């Protein structure tokens, strides 16, 4: 399985944790993490939320492939077991984590699924680390590994 995570961020403040879960996931799947941040996004974020969201969408469009999942606070809440079932039979997964302003509704609706990790607003850098842990947990559930108790 190929797992892709696309995130609007310049750097990874949670790099140590991200690397830990990336290594664990590599036992089950090929993982590609791409931090998308360019000059257009930086300028748009200084203008307003609408322009920022448009710039995120433009940056993400070339990466829409496989089963696409938006991380969205208005998305569906799943248990870890439900999440494991959701990703179980997919050949390729692409997760999209918006920047400070989130993602446009139209972009979210164009994807296959909208996932909420929490009703709380979370820093997008933290969301990526939390998502990596849940992906690893899902692989453990699907492979009867004792990590998920």
Curated annotation (Swiss-Prot):
Enzyme superclass (EC): transferase
E.C. number: 2.1.1.177
Cysteine disulfide links: none
The reaction(s) this protein catalyses: pseudouridine(1915) in 23S rRNA + S-adenosyl-L-methionine = N(3)-methylpseudouridine(1915) in 23S rRNA + S-adenosyl-L-homocysteine + H(+)
GO CC aspect terms: cytoplasm
Function: Specifically methylates the pseudouridine at position 1915 (m3Psi1915) in 23S rRNA.
Name of this chain's protein: Ribosomal RNA large subunit methyltransferase H
Name of the coding gene: rlmH
